[in-house]
Amino acid sequence: KDDIHLDEEKAELGMMAVGYYAILESAFRFNKNLSIENQSDFVAEMYAYFSKVASRNKDAWTDSALDANEIKNITKKNSLQAFPYNKYHCTSWNVNQSAAIIVCSEKIADDLDIPQEKRVYPLASSENNHMIGTLQRPKLYEQHGMQLAAKYILDVCQKLKIEPNFYDLYSCFPVAVQMFAESLNLSDYKKFTITGGMSFAGGPLN
């Protein structure tokens, strides 16, 4: 949101999101006491896995799987956007896709002969608008809105004794994916996506 950016932020970073998320990535890494090299390797391996998942997703915009070195190393095709992010770390503006979730009653689904195995029954959703300007956050590596949204879902799962089978942590930049995972108590990046993520399966503003 434009109204939560301070004048100092706009002067230094402009309004391009990659600069903000790159700073959050560095803060997140520093809080974990990880070296730049170790974090770079981890993110590259995670996104290489995402790319592999997307290559098998018929609805993804790309079917070419990238390896970790292709994502990590700066090249003409993978230029530096804002340290530590290269192009392949970021979502692509040029992707033009759309998707829809159709919500209807069970009677309508019956009338339309929707097979039972094709139906999904939503149990809960969570949204949080607890947004704070980047420079106003006490700790750059903590996202309270994200944590509150995740806690609600985790509490519902606990109450209903549900263990989720699938996750899709879908965001423009790696640090947001990692923060989502941490908020949901996930550590294995092979559980983070079933689509391939926004960088390889989709795009922003679609």
List PLM regions with ranges:
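C-terminal catalytic subdomain
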Residues: 206
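Conserved "HGTGT" condensation-loop signature of ketosynthase/thiolase-family condensing enzymes
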Residues: 1-108, 114-203
